[in-house]
Design a protein with these regions (language model features):
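Active-site-adjacent helix/loop segment of glycosyltransferases
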Residues: 194-335
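A recurrent flexible, glycine/aromatic-enriched loop bordering the glycosyltransferase active site
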Residues: 127, 140-160, 175, 181, ...
Length: 344
């Protein structure tokens, strides 16, 4: 006798982008057990009166539930979604991914292979890059998702593990680090995190010339991670350190040059300015070297390489101020009452 199909719900936070239709179309294709429900959390601002722009395939029409997310970010939106779903497994998908062929069947196999102590199973993520040329800086940044750990682009959690950990921490306001934070708490609660066999593609989203500058807001979230999980959180979350130490040094050199110039110390200003210029040039060269080296990309790298270090340091400083004295993640007793984690 074959084992019964696993019961699961799908939760997708969305801003109503057109790519949501692509996710739903991929979910409807192939074979395998259907989810009990597909919860779309509408995370647009609450004052937006328009209905969520979505085209639901006929096969999913009876399963779709659209709930308001109030525009408080993906962590809060995912909490809104999974708390509405009683199923034992919650599959989180981003609204800009493309689940692979036969995704439902592959998910069922991943869940069937999960042991009683498995709290979460991550998909294998791929990032398609344009053929025939080197990827841009933004494309390479997105490609890093293929090797990232515990990203909720496609990650299924056991509901009892979510209850045990208290869900996503809504103090993470953007799609950055909120997934690693939850995974560390699930692991700390004694659950295992594994990688399954199902596959999902994460296409590169179109982005403006300043996307890499806006991404520096994540440095404030890194401060929150250190406050919550200790200074070695990167090792446990398998998150590379990145260039922040170099950004801090370059920013310090630039600030020193400006101060020296303002106080009439020309020699000190020249020395500090030379250090700033050398650091900025090295950063730009490191970003240009693996890229397509078109005129547009070259100018974009030169300009943003000068701007990124001080912006990164600024967000880090804001994070220090905002998260000073921060406490552990709050566990919602109303979610946990009457439920047990289901492992030893």
């Amino acid at each position: 006798m074959s084992a019964p199909d696993p019961e699961y719900a799908v939760v997708i936070p969305t801003l109503g982008r057109a790519c949501l239709n692509r996710v739903l179309a991929a979910l409807a294709e192939g074979d395998g057990p259907w989810p009990a429900r597909v919860i779309l959390v509408d995370d647009r601002p609450p004052h937006d009166p328009r209905p969520l722009p979505v085209e639901v395939p006929g096969e999913l029409a009876a399963l779709i539930e659209i709930v308001p997310g109030c525009g408080r970010g993906p962590a809060a939106a995912r909490n809104t979604g999974w708390r509405r779903a009683p199923e034992p497994w919650i599959a989180f998908l981003d609204d800009d991914v493309v689940p692979g062929p036969h995704w439902r069947r592959a998910l069922a196999a991943d869940l069937a292979a999960a042991g009683g102590g498995t709290g979460g199973v991550q998909a294998r993520i791929s990032v398609p890059l344009p053929p025939g040329r080197r990827p841009t800086d933004w494309e390479r940044s997105t490609a890093g998702l293929a090797t990232a750990s515990w990203i909720t682009a496609d990650l299924v959690y056991r509901r009892s593990a979510l209850l045990d950990a208290g869900g996503f921490d809504e103090r993470f306001p953007r799609a950055f680090r909120e997934d690693a934070d939850l995974a560390l708490r699930v692991l700390a609660a004694g659950w295992e995190m594994t990688v399954g066999e199902r596959r999902t593609a994460h296409p590169v989203r179109p982005a403006g010339p300043w996307a890499s500058v806006r991404a520096q807001a994540g440095n404030a979230d890194d401060v929150l991670m250190a406050r919550l999980h200790g200074r070695d959180w990167r090792r446990r979350a398998r998150a590379p350190r990145g260039r922040f130490p170099a950004h801090a040094a370059v920013t310090a050199a630039g600030a020193a040059a400006l101060v020296a110039l303002g106080t009439g110390r020309r020699r000190a200003a020249l020395m500090s300015g030379a250090l700033w210029l050398a650091g900025t040039a090295e950063f730009a060269a490191a970003r240009i070297r693996p890229g397509p080296r078109t005129g547009t990309e070259l100018w974009r790298m030169v300009l943003t390489s000068a701007v990124i270090p001080p912006v990164a340091v600024g967000h880090w400083a804001l994070g220090l101020a905002r998260h000073r004295g921060v406490g552990p993640h709050p566990v919602f007793k109303s979610d946990i009452s009457g439920n047990s984690p289901g492992h030893g």
